[in-house]
Amino acid sequence: MFLNGFLRRLTRKIKQHGYAFFVVSVDGIATGVKGSVKGSFSVASLDPMVMENIEKCAILHNEDPHIAYPHEQPFALPRKGKAKSVKGFAKSMKGKAKENSKPKDILFPTFLDYSSQTAYIASILLNKYRIETFLLQNMAHLYRELIPCFDYDSWECVADALREKANEIFEANISRNLMLLILTGLYDNLVPHHQQEVFNKASNKFLKELEEKMDTSDPRVVIFLICLTMVLCAGGGFFSCKRHSNKKRSKASYTPPVPDNYAIFNDLGKYKAKVPVFEWQNAHAHSLGIMPLPPNLVNEMSSEEIKEAILEVPKEAAKGLVYGIPHFLIGSVVNSFTGVKYILMRVGTVVFFTIAGPFILLDYVKDRVREYYWFVTRNFSNFREFLFHAITSLLSLFPGGKMFQE
């Protein structure tokens, strides 16, 4: 019943905007389902590969109890005193917050959700260039591919390394000047503003400047740009640099020990700092599975068809739900020392996935059974023939089995 209500609301928004875009993400500290801007939706899911990354984060945290969680990060929401910078961010998250309200009174108080910002940029690009078939199942893989490219001390070297990867992964030929523009544009404009409106204006300005210099006729270039944007935004990597360099906050900010995958950019002028390329201590190991529904299809689809399309996204991560729920339940109890509200919020999130998980799994199993039934009835005249084929195929795997099959 709860799931149906959730799907109904999504369906209504999809019909309203004419285009749907989903980001499936995981966060090691807090997860949730929320509507995002421009008809994009951030749907929390638990992908086994990402859970592996989160576990690594947890191991690192256990080794050194002083490694900060997101609420202790310099770029996260403040924990004490007046939270003026929270106002715009809270409004975009919940739609209501008093100017002097404390973070604990807000729905997601302890981390900045980069996935909504990422979805905003990517949905603009996908809408604009009508890329109708784009599915990126696992951002964790892309992190591993792109992160080594940032292990240099100048933007020029980083640009060259990324160009090479763009050609290797996407067969996209991107000029060095364009890559530099993308890198500096992303860095200068996409600092994680607490105010969603400010962020939207900055990203729109960047996209407009990019459009003037980019050959948009090649969708592979656009796809690579989307991927790069998501790596930079969802990883939270570059953004702590500006905060660390802020003298007013430097004493209060906790700077964690610097692991091997930090890069030192000396050519950033006033932004000189050790910049974490992938903030493992922030546990932002996001798995971003992207499924756009093209406008022409949305207009022709019934509400039931849209619901099926929505459920298609988390199916692959359904097994991860079963694995991840105990992990998050334990994490909720261990890390929830900030009050009853926070505990209820986190347990409530887990309860949602506990309710939704069986529905998604059941739907997944039904689809697989339907597929196997279709395969059997289409290829074999009766069950005996299918059984004979299955046994001989199995025997063929053993030494001498091929002869028996013949």
UniProtKB/Swiss-Prot annotation:
Q: What is its main location?
A: plastid
Q: Which UniProt key words apply to this protein? A: Chloroplast, Plastid
Q: Which GO terms describe its cellular component?
A: chloroplast
Name used for this protein in its record: Uncharacterized 46.2 kDa protein in 16S rRNA 5'region
**Cellular localization per UniProt:** Plastid, Chloroplast
